[in-house]
């Protein structure tokens, strides 16, 4: 409150109070009209806070509604809130785009061999987002017939990146039979055998 004094110079004086009201009703203004997308293949663990300006002296507090890390494939919209500390806020949104476009690493699979039969074990590989992946197949895992067979393994990272890798299964008997007895008894006859 300001008290004004009026004096007419003849000894007549009056005072009049006047209220001075300072009321910030202007919200902060974001420094960037739009926020650039934040992109990654697997996850976003931190976000860089944008800035805003205010008509009054003081700092603008910046917060967001994100739960970090952001790992969901696709677009997550983060809302930033600028608060001038005087009851005025402004919001601005920013897209966080997670898009895994990298295939799993193609493993080099050794042939599986056996003489009478051969059984495959599902192989593994690595993925930039999925970590360790185990191959799947609709082919048989065990083979009991002589020959070469091909198992097609599929590695799917769950984000739309799928590779297939062949693996040979070779059943090849290379061992000669072993007699049940070490030596055979002589066969003798007088006329013929």
Please place each PLM-identified region on the residue numbering.
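Proline-threonine-serine-rich low-complexity tracts
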Residues: 1-193
